[in-house]
Amino acid sequence: MKAMNRIAMVIAGTVLTAGLLLAANVTEVKWKTASEAFTEAKASNKKIVLDVYTDWCGWCKRMDKSTYGNADVAESLEKNYVAAKMNPEKEGTVQYQGKNYTQAEFAQALGISGYPATAFFDESGELLTVIPGFVQPADFQKVLTYFAENIHKTTTWEEYSKKK
Protein backbone atom coordinates (compact mmCIF):
# COMPACT_ATOMS: atom_id res chain seq x y z
CA MET A 1 0.00 0.00 0.00
CA LYS A 2 2.86 2.37 0.82
CA ALA A 3 4.35 1.74 -2.63
CA MET A 4 1.05 2.71 -4.27
CA ASN A 5 0.90 5.93 -2.25
CA ARG A 6 4.47 6.81 -3.26
CA ILE A 7 3.71 6.14 -6.93
CA ALA A 8 0.57 8.28 -6.71
CA MET A 9 2.56 11.10 -5.07
CA VAL A 10 5.28 10.94 -7.74
CA ILE A 11 2.68 11.02 -10.52
CA ALA A 12 0.81 13.91 -8.89
CA GLY A 13 4.05 15.85 -8.43
CA THR A 14 5.07 15.25 -12.04
CA VAL A 15 1.68 16.36 -13.36
CA LEU A 16 1.70 19.47 -11.16
CA THR A 17 5.24 20.41 -12.24
CA ALA A 18 4.42 19.90 -15.92
CA GLY A 19 1.30 22.02 -15.56
CA LEU A 20 3.24 24.84 -13.92
CA LEU A 21 5.91 24.73 -16.63
CA LEU A 22 3.29 24.87 -19.38
CA ALA A 23 1.50 27.74 -17.66
CA ALA A 24 4.79 29.66 -17.37
CA ASN A 25 5.27 29.45 -21.15
CA VAL A 26 1.86 30.94 -21.94
CA THR A 27 2.10 34.61 -22.83
CA GLU A 28 -0.83 36.69 -21.68
CA VAL A 29 -1.57 40.12 -23.03
CA LYS A 30 -0.92 42.82 -20.46
CA TRP A 31 -3.73 45.26 -21.15
CA LYS A 32 -3.46 48.98 -20.39
CA THR A 33 -6.03 51.74 -20.49
CA ALA A 34 -6.02 53.85 -23.63
CA SER A 35 -4.43 56.82 -21.84
CA GLU A 36 -1.72 54.61 -20.32
CA ALA A 37 -1.03 53.13 -23.74
CA PHE A 38 -0.49 56.52 -25.42
CA THR A 39 1.94 57.55 -22.67
CA GLU A 40 3.81 54.23 -22.70
CA ALA A 41 3.99 54.07 -26.51
CA LYS A 42 5.87 57.36 -26.69
CA ALA A 43 8.31 56.23 -23.99
CA SER A 44 8.85 52.74 -25.46
CA ASN A 45 8.61 53.70 -29.15
CA LYS A 46 5.98 51.00 -29.74
CA LYS A 47 2.79 51.09 -31.74
CA ILE A 48 -0.59 50.70 -30.02
CA VAL A 49 -3.35 48.14 -30.48
CA LEU A 50 -6.61 49.33 -28.92
CA ASP A 51 -9.32 46.69 -28.46
CA VAL A 52 -12.70 48.43 -28.30
CA TYR A 53 -15.32 46.14 -26.78
CA THR A 54 -18.47 45.98 -24.67
CA ASP A 55 -19.45 43.60 -21.88
CA TRP A 56 -22.52 42.27 -23.72
CA CYS A 57 -20.75 41.59 -27.03
CA GLY A 58 -20.42 37.88 -27.80
CA TRP A 59 -17.94 38.44 -30.63
CA CYS A 60 -15.80 40.54 -28.27
CA LYS A 61 -15.63 37.62 -25.84
CA ARG A 62 -14.74 35.29 -28.70
CA MET A 63 -11.99 37.68 -29.85
CA ASP A 64 -10.59 37.72 -26.30
CA LYS A 65 -10.59 33.96 -26.04
CA SER A 66 -9.51 32.83 -29.50
CA THR A 67 -7.54 35.75 -30.94
CA TYR A 68 -5.96 37.52 -27.96
CA GLY A 69 -5.73 34.14 -26.21
CA ASN A 70 -3.65 32.75 -29.10
CA ALA A 71 -0.02 32.32 -27.98
CA ASP A 72 1.47 33.74 -31.21
CA VAL A 73 -0.81 36.79 -31.16
CA ALA A 74 -0.15 37.42 -27.46
CA GLU A 75 3.61 37.11 -27.97
CA SER A 76 3.56 39.51 -30.93
CA LEU A 77 1.48 42.03 -29.00
CA GLU A 78 3.81 41.82 -26.01
CA LYS A 79 6.95 42.18 -28.14
CA ASN A 80 5.88 44.87 -30.62
CA TYR A 81 2.93 46.80 -29.22
CA VAL A 82 1.39 48.46 -26.23
CA ALA A 83 -1.95 46.68 -25.90
CA ALA A 84 -4.96 48.57 -24.56
CA LYS A 85 -8.63 47.87 -23.99
CA MET A 86 -11.48 50.33 -23.90
CA ASN A 87 -15.18 49.83 -23.20
CA PRO A 88 -17.04 52.91 -24.50
CA GLU A 89 -20.05 52.04 -22.35
CA LYS A 90 -18.04 52.48 -19.14
CA GLU A 91 -16.97 55.61 -17.30
CA GLY A 92 -13.47 56.78 -17.96
CA THR A 93 -11.50 59.32 -19.90
CA VAL A 94 -8.91 59.09 -22.62
CA GLN A 95 -6.18 61.68 -22.97
CA TYR A 96 -5.31 61.87 -26.65
CA GLN A 97 -3.25 64.52 -28.41
CA GLY A 98 -3.83 67.14 -25.73
CA LYS A 99 -7.57 66.58 -25.40
CA ASN A 100 -9.70 64.69 -22.90
CA TYR A 101 -12.47 62.44 -24.21
CA THR A 102 -14.93 60.17 -22.53
CA GLN A 103 -14.43 56.62 -23.74
CA ALA A 104 -17.65 56.91 -25.76
CA GLU A 105 -16.48 60.16 -27.36
CA PHE A 106 -13.13 58.63 -28.23
CA ALA A 107 -14.74 55.61 -29.89
CA GLN A 108 -16.96 57.99 -31.86
CA ALA A 109 -13.95 60.12 -32.85
CA LEU A 110 -12.32 56.96 -34.22
CA GLY A 111 -15.46 56.22 -36.25
CA ILE A 112 -16.29 53.11 -34.24
CA SER A 113 -19.98 52.24 -34.08
CA GLY A 114 -19.89 48.44 -33.70
CA TYR A 115 -18.03 45.96 -31.55
CA PRO A 116 -15.50 44.54 -31.42
CA ALA A 117 -13.25 46.97 -33.22
CA THR A 118 -9.47 47.19 -33.18
CA ALA A 119 -7.65 50.49 -33.65
CA PHE A 120 -3.97 50.63 -34.58
CA PHE A 121 -1.86 53.70 -33.77
CA ASP A 122 1.76 54.47 -34.61
CA GLU A 123 4.41 55.27 -32.00
CA SER A 124 3.44 58.95 -31.88
CA GLY A 125 -0.25 58.18 -31.43
CA GLU A 126 -1.41 58.80 -34.99
CA LEU A 127 -4.27 56.55 -36.05
CA LEU A 128 -3.20 54.00 -38.66
CA THR A 129 -6.49 52.15 -39.13
CA VAL A 130 -9.56 50.71 -37.44
CA ILE A 131 -10.56 47.13 -38.16
CA PRO A 132 -14.22 46.43 -37.42
CA GLY A 133 -15.46 43.08 -36.19
CA PHE A 134 -14.01 39.77 -35.08
CA VAL A 135 -10.67 38.75 -36.64
CA GLN A 136 -9.36 35.17 -36.65
CA PRO A 137 -5.95 34.68 -34.97
CA ALA A 138 -4.04 33.91 -38.21
CA ASP A 139 -5.49 36.97 -39.95
CA PHE A 140 -4.84 39.16 -36.91
CA GLN A 141 -1.23 37.98 -36.82
CA LYS A 142 -0.83 39.14 -40.44
CA VAL A 143 -2.09 42.59 -39.47
CA LEU A 144 0.23 42.71 -36.46
CA THR A 145 3.21 41.87 -38.69
CA TYR A 146 2.12 44.37 -41.35
CA PHE A 147 2.29 47.27 -38.90
CA ALA A 148 5.07 46.04 -36.57
CA GLU A 149 7.50 45.62 -39.47
CA ASN A 150 6.40 48.94 -41.05
CA ILE A 151 5.32 47.16 -44.21
CA HIS A 152 2.39 49.58 -44.34
CA LYS A 153 4.84 52.35 -45.27
CA THR A 154 5.81 50.74 -48.57
CA THR A 155 3.08 48.24 -49.46
CA THR A 156 -0.70 48.47 -49.54
CA TRP A 157 -2.69 45.99 -47.48
CA GLU A 158 -4.15 44.55 -50.68
CA GLU A 159 -0.68 43.79 -52.08
CA TYR A 160 0.61 42.44 -48.77
CA SER A 161 -2.36 40.21 -48.04
CA LYS A 162 -2.09 38.58 -51.49
CA LYS A 163 1.54 37.59 -50.82
CA LYS A 164 0.92 35.92 -47.49
Question: Which residue ranges define each predicted feature?
Answer:
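Short active-site neighborhood of thiol/selenol oxidoreductases, capturing the structured segment around
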Residues: 44-58, 83
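Structural alpha/beta surface segment adjacent to cysteine/selenocysteine redox centers
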Residues: 86-113
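Bacterial N-terminal signal peptides
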Residues: 10-19
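Typically the conserved alpha-helix immediately C-terminal to a functionally engaged Cys/Sec
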Residues: 60-78
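Non-catalytic, surface beta->alpha helical segment in thiol-disulfide oxidoreductase systems
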Residues: 66-68, 108-153
